[in-house]
Amino acid sequence: MNSFGTRGTLEVGGRQYEIFRLPALKERGMDPARLPYSLRILLENLLRMEDGVTVTAADIEALAGWRPGTVSDREIAFMPGRVLLQDFTGVPAVVDLAAMRDAMSALGGDPRRINPLQPVELVIDHSVQVDAFASAEAFSINEELDYRRNGERYAFLRWGQQAFDNFRVVPPNTGIVHQVNLEYLARVVFTSDENAAAEGPVQAYPDTVVGTDSHTPMVNGLGVLGWGVGGIEAEAAMLGQPVSMLIPDVVGFRLSGALPEGATATDLVLTVTEMLRKKGVVGKFVEFYGPGLASLALADRATIGNMSPEYGATCAIFPVDEVTLRYLRFTGRPEERVALVEAYMKEQGLFHTADSPEPLFSDTIELDLDTVEPSLAGPRRPQDRIRLSEAGVSFRKALPSLLPTRSLTQKEAPTGVAAGPDAVGVWGEGSPDSPSLENGGASGTAGGLTNGSVVIAAITSCTNTSNPSVMLAAGLLAKKAVEKGLTRKPWVKSSLAPGSKVVTRYYEAADLTRYLDELGFQTVGYGCTTCIGNSGPLPTAISQEIQDRDLVAVAALSGNRNFEGRINSDVRANYLMSPPLVVAFALAGRIDINLYEEPLGSGKDGKPVFLRDIWPTRAEIEETVQRAVRSAMFRETYAAVFNGDERWNSMPVPAGVHFAWEPDSTYVRLPPYFEGMTREAPRTVPDVTGARALLLLGDSITTDHISPAGGIKKDSPAGRYLVEKGVGPADFNSYGSRRGNHEVMVRGTFANTRIRNVLAPGTEGGFTTYFPTGEVMTVYDASVRYQADGTPLVVIAGKEYGSGSSRDWAAKGPRLQGVHVAIAESYERIHRSNLVGLGILPLQFMPGENAASIGLTGRETYDVEGASRAIAANFAGGREVTVRARGEGGEKTFRATIRIDTPQEVLYYRHGGILKYVLRQLLSGKEKAEAISGGPATANKNGTTEAVTQNSAQSFPASDSPAY
């Protein structure tokens, strides 16, 4: 359709492209020129996708008429141009697609209809772990272990590559997904002939993306609109379903000035994160503008976009300008692409110049870049920024809250990785066999460890390794440190994990590799590593000392997240910082230090060496960038990015439309999501009655708390399951690598070693009380008993529930444990969407209320009244429900709001989840689901409207309820 007459043509380089011209709307009385850049991208998407059903003329008029201060409940359908995956979320996504093919066949449909209609690119980056370090052999050892542990998963992804159209895989140890996206995959302007499923004339349109990793907005720095979604939402997008959303608020972030001497892009993004968390931008778009844009390199912009989830925004976008074009050329994009980007963006009024009118925004915030100062963030949250000079004071203040709570379980390091230094030579050539550890020694001395000792120093994460300025600053600092005679402290596990092989090339060109090597920062792999918790084990002596003395050890990393329990189970305090500061803290060996006033150590002349003595100047950094970083490095590195090495290509790969599931596999299992599914959706959604609380939690519960990605303990439910299946602890691998096996993942849900459940006082880790007997046991074991009793479950939490990673297993796991309802003070955007997409009802306390103010103990039974009726009426009477909590002290009643936010989400929930909705759509061939009628129903604890099926050792809710 073309209701507004915007279809036109654009000729660039002798080729003609069909486009939908935004300026043409002015002729219809709608002028998008003052809309935020991000909303203009969405507007073009609606114009191009208009079909009168999914996208209507009224949708287009509503978005084109957006103005600050207007509150709209208009739902729009955004169709991303492509989907981006990483392997931890990508494997379960492909597992789900394979299971959908089986279900499609079982229900009489064509399994080939389960096929991506949008281009899908998966980068394997989340699996490699830092087993070996500080050694010339570290990379080869870690790569060997990576293939040994994950070969079955990689073969499964190679099956997916041949079984599905429009699906490409970047092999392991190539780079980090967001850096590869920034440097190579992102087009800025997409053409429809790049989509194998596209038909009709070749169209040109803005590159847009959704990704199964919350840091997908890194590409916003390039002017590409995109954000993170849960795996199931990404699967729906692959299969042609739009992303349903309300027209967002857009917060303008005005930048002025320029970064001062000594401040880095990392310091800037930590400052932005602190400011925007205080501002409150959850679920909103953030858009950067102002005179300060011109002073920021593209890599600096990408760093800011990368941490969008840390400050809660859906995206954090910069407009396309001359800086963008220079970066595209510099990273080796074809000149034809750059010419198309320039011509298209200028034609559409999307190209930013100094003369561009300032857009209108819902709200604004401002930062003078000149005020940014060296910073770090920690010990638990990215928004908790600390001035570098106050690191020691801040740590000592936080220390009481970091001291361990005794767990019921025997203390042990996570298994599934090679244990101790002897296995992999982690101490490296010329390093001590192990540090000398003596009780009572002061941190930062050779005498031993104490609270505040830095035991991990990792240059890691695409947030910073995509930025040549901060990476070369780290190399220059290392060079000066070596020349002064400094060494890293012997208890520090140091590592360098670039997000692209380009980094290695420019380090070599700058002659800095040898200095980093000398300080123990050898390359350990090209992947996420420490940033996502794949830090590997600490040397045995270090780990044992920390555990025996209950020390608060520290990780210093150039990552984007520092949630408790994320980086390493032996580490209780995690600090985010720039790469050069990571090197500095490796030299100091402790966090409780003022680097402005205290020396890093003594030089070879015996004199103290301070940070100021080795910190590189801006002029030194810029000169090194100009000299060492070359465009050819990008072209040559990415020329064969999809090809893989001999190990990748020699892997045996299964073939066929259907995947041949191995019943004994502990990595890839047929999930139970479609068991018992019928072609028709259930008529009603039952209310929940007689529910028990599985957990009562506090604020800032992350998806890492809910579904950890790191090591698996031998005595945990998941560890016991693997042992029963014949897997030794050395081969456990990580939870993240086991996401293709629901049996492992349901057992690992709420198993984070740092989670604290009020219902199991005095414990730390995944414990709860099974109230019928009063026994304290693991969350998983209690969930099995409750499901056997037919008791639905509730999780109660505080503010920012589900913050952090986009992982859908933080919703899948609770659902498979029998959780029907979550009640929280507030939700992070992606997790709330994932809960709905899995059939869990998200309820939100009324403003100013929480579990404590209402007087909930978590020991009550809970009835949710009115949800079935409200959902059946599409919330015509409002979204509020009544919750009755019955306990020994009587009954408490409170109101809560249903957080099913869009009409499309109502359909997902009614169908029992997004995957069933999509499968039924493909079976019926309908563009839109029929309205589902029927009155309210009730599911009681005896399960009168739900069946329970058995799958392996775990009971799962019936497939045709909103659960599964």
Task: Label every PLM stretch briefly.
Residues 603-618, 831-908:
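Acidic, glycine-rich flexible loop/linker segments
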Residues 932-964:
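A charge-rich, low-complexity, intrinsically flexible signal that marks solvent-exposed coils, linkers
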Residues 51-258, 265-270, 374-377, 396-521, ...:
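Long, structured ligand/cofactor-binding scaffold of large enzymes
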Residues 186, 200-352, 368, 470-493, ...:
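Mobile "lid/hinge" segments at catalytic clefts and subdomain interfaces of large enzymes
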